[in-house]
Amino acid sequence: MTTPVASMAVIGAGSYGTALAITLARNGHPVVLWGHDPAHIAALEAARCNQAFLPDVRFPDTLSLESDLSRTLSASRDVLVVVPSHVFGDVLRQLRPHLRPDARLVWATKGLEAETGRLLQDVACEALGPDIPLAVISGPTFAKELAAGLPTAIAVASQDAAFAEVLQQLLHCGKSFRVYRNPDFIGVQLGGAVKNVIAIGAGMSDGIGFGANARTALITRGLAEMSRLGVALGADPATFMGMAGLGDLVLTCTDNQSRNRRFGIMLGQGMGVDEAQVQIGQVVEGYRNTKEVMSLAQRYGVEMPITEQIYQVLYCHKDVREAALSLLGRASRDENAR
């Protein structure tokens, strides 16, 4: 079987990968969506929709499906990776032998490398070499709303300005999907990881029943933690007031479509960490991200008290209420202190 030439190959047929593939195809671009399970891909092809995650959204005719990696990657120069952060490096190493010589890679994965806390750009350079153009897209996006064609805005960042412009043109749709370029490659990556952690904290607060005041305080101080860590890594602080920072943070902390927020709510209501993850039924990126962000903060000497207390709950069995009281009992300080 020959896979048709595509404007983009999307790696990862979960909810978000499928939604992005649908969006690209609706823009009139030929897209091939790859999944690792041939049976799953066959089911998607038969139904012409993703029954598990987006059952009401039909695939456009320009979206094709594939489970063979070689055929998928030969079809397109541009490759969009949408997989959980803890398998990101492994997936890239699988891709490498099949990539075209002119390949360019972008990811929508939000997080850091498991255990090491490295930015995904470093993982990608190690897995694919230093010469391939890299980019990241991030921002306040729920898969169901994106796939339904509801208005959405994101940021795209790359050290290759021409590639960023190509991605902006491929994704941008005047009716529903707005794409902003941002030159801050580090900041756009980091925002997507830290917001996952803070969203768990916001969920915990709501699960306890602390109310809107506490949730808003967590979001605001969480943004300060995100910015402090970002500046320490060389990011532009203005990025954290944009789509990949404040935008994604507010969305994930306030809407129950967020798995990280729902996970936190369950913990706040007294459920154990393992049981809550089972109840969610999909990857809770913030669980691993908490350990990774905490590692980065310690490495760079950045104070992140909210992240630290969430880490204590997730990995040290600290009671959620006790963690909240630890935050409230901290010494008074200047709001703008770094």
From Swiss-Prot:
Single GO molecular function: NAD binding
Family of the protein in this entry: Belongs to the NAD-dependent glycerol-3-phosphate dehydrogenase family.
SUPFAM superfamilies for this protein: 6-phosphogluconate dehydrogenase C-terminal domain-like, NAD(P)-binding Rossmann-fold domains
PANTHER family xref list: GLYCEROL-3-PHOSPHATE DEHYDROGENASE (PTHR11728), GLYCEROL-3-PHOSPHATE DEHYDROGENASE [NAD(+)] 2, CHLOROPLASTIC (PTHR11728:SF1)
Gene3D superfamilies: N-(1-d-carboxylethyl)-l-norvaline Dehydrogenase, domain 2, NAD(P)-binding Rossmann-like Domain
Annotated sn-glycerol 3-phosphate binding sites: K110, G139, T141, K195, D248, S258, R259, N260
EC number: 1.1.1.94
GO BP annotation list: carbohydrate metabolic process; glycerol-3-phosphate biosynthetic process; glycerol-3-phosphate catabolic process; glycerophospholipid biosynthetic process
Positions that bind NADPH: S15, Y16, H36, K110, A143, R259, V283, E285
Enzyme class: oxidoreductase
Organism ancestry: Bacteria, Pseudomonadati, Pseudomonadota, Gammaproteobacteria, Enterobacterales
Job description of the protein: Catalyzes the reduction of the glycolytic intermediate dihydroxyacetone phosphate (DHAP) to sn-glycerol 3-phosphate (G3P), the key precursor for phospholipid synthesis.
Pfam families, A to Z: NAD_Gly3P_dh_C, NAD_Gly3P_dh_N
Protein name (Swiss-Prot/TrEMBL): Glycerol-3-phosphate dehydrogenase [NAD(P)+]
Key words of the record: Cytoplasm, Lipid biosynthesis, Lipid metabolism, NAD, NADP, Nucleotide-binding, Oxidoreductase, Phospholipid biosynthesis, Phospholipid metabolism
Cysteine pairs bridged by disulfides in the record: none
